[in-house]
């Protein structure tokens, strides 16, 4: 085995390799993730999912979180800037998907995302980022 390709552990999730599919808005749906798994991806992420939309019970948003039939382990990426909303969204994600990982989007630079205090805006407000992360971890039961 090459030293570049090796097993990885995320919390209690053990993966046979370190080829991850990044979350890409508009692309990382279940069908695309399935094809990537067939071609060697060991772990995948959904495209970013709006915490606000999940809390409002938006069906189109829930569809984004569906597990592909060949996904053994995957992450649902959520975005938002309000700790309470993010916590409620994390609870909904776990209830509906049983995903192995919940990822908090802190990197999206798109203006319509950052103007709400989400995405990369969280990195400019460490206190808020901490509160969001703390709320999500608590809602996920420390997983």
Predicted regions, residues:
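Structural preference for beta-strand elements that scaffold enzyme active sites
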Residues: 18-20, 43, 73-77, 101-103, ...
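A short acidic, helix-capping loop that chelates divalent metal ions and anchors anionic groups
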Residues: 54, 110-116
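Glycine-rich, positively charged N-terminal anion/phosphate-binding segment
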Residues: 2-9, 24-97
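Non-cysteine beta-strand/loop elements that form the S-adenosyl-L-methionine
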Residues: 46, 101-110
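Alpha-helix-loop-beta-strand connector modules within alpha/beta enzyme cores
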Residues: 62-75, 122-143
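Non-catalytic, substrate/partner-engaging modules appended to enzymatic cores
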Residues: 15-16, 34
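Conserved non-cysteine loop/helix-boundary elements of the Radical SAM core domain that shape
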Residues: 51, 116-127
